[in-house]
Amino acid sequence: MSKPDIIQLLKMAIQRQFGMSINTIAELKIFQEELEYRTREVISFNTLRRFFDFLPSTKPSSKTIRILCKYLGFNNISNFLSQESMDINWLLWNKALGIELTKKLDERDLLWLKENSNQPDFYLHLATIIKSFIYRKKYGVIVTLFEQEDIVNFSMNVYSKFASMLCRLFRSLNKNELQNVIIYLIPIKSFRESVLHWYIDYTNLNGYYGDFLEAALPASNKESHEYLFYQLILNYRSFLLNIDNLEYLPTSRIKKDFFVVLKGRSYSYNLVYYNKNNDEAGKGETWNEILFQLDQNINIFLFMLEIMITLLLLKEFDKISYLIDEYYEDLLAPTNWTGYHVHSTVLLGHSVQLLYEGSFMQAKKTFQLINTTKIDGSYKEYNMIFYHLIEYQIALTTHAEDKNLKAIENKYLGYVQKTGFTFFSVDYLKKYLLK
């Protein structure tokens, strides 16, 4: 919370405690007398005039803040903010619960949602409200919510959390319920961009998520970033399902204003496309384009989000080694919850590099740095296929017993079955390091 917000919160709490708004000098004078009586301390009248905006405001001293908090019954500003946060959070949940129980949204509900959209955990309240209306089959209400640009408007990190909550909800719906949600929500661009783009559910590409993408493709503008996004993901799904006839989606379709992750995804898919068609020249040209992009002023972590795991998929060990040597720190840049699946991919890539170079003990140590309990979200099952794939290769270097190799193989196949990605065969597992 910013300092101006803290001061505003303190002003509101003081006036609640005082029992009336402080809008006039006379009211301020009465407040000063009560303040001195209750705290047995003094704040000058001019200081109070500045604090309540009767004079040009200045930053209040720590002594002024301490006395005002004392008036409210707190030892310091931290104690005040802690209690105020709990009160605000309760009021938000209480109001959100009331909205959940309504049959439709009125103007007052929408106004309240807009006014509170900047609260730290607002996305939780909004997702909970949407969940309630979905379970009650009030789809029109959800349409109204997504049509409000001031309500569904988050930072990148929060979009990921919001989309994660809704997509996990969609997993629980039966076919008829899911179809109704698709019919109502897919035509709304803000829904597509705030949910489908931020939670790519690899585990359910053959389920609800794939259904959403197939419906979203014809609903979007063919020249838009989202149309390319749907094409890339759906064709990538086809590759993982061993379906031939992948579409040619050239990187020339990338526009300057496209999000950096989408740009990286486009290059990633082209590596897959040219590999599938045994076009070494096309694959080489795409790799050179990737290297060119890495020399530009871009967010390398976001650009490489899909590329590293594609290189693992295609067994491009030399390229993985180059990236690890040149961009290791950049690839491990973010530390929040949304980035760990990429961290694990980079560590897998580093392990493969070391295996490829014959540094078996160091490969094992690097592999052991991966904390699988932190791999969560939409990439979890997909990442775990690669985790057990590399685990198997390391086990081979340590001359593991057949029963241990079989146990790893079964875990690998369990995730393959869960995703349906038949590209990952037993033969692929056992011959991975043989190019």
Segments the model singles out, each with a brief description of its role:
Residues 123-435:
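Extended amphipathic alpha-helical coiled-coil/heptad-repeat regions
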Residues 19-23, 34-60, 67-69:
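Recognition helix of helix-turn-helix/homeodomain-like DNA-binding domains
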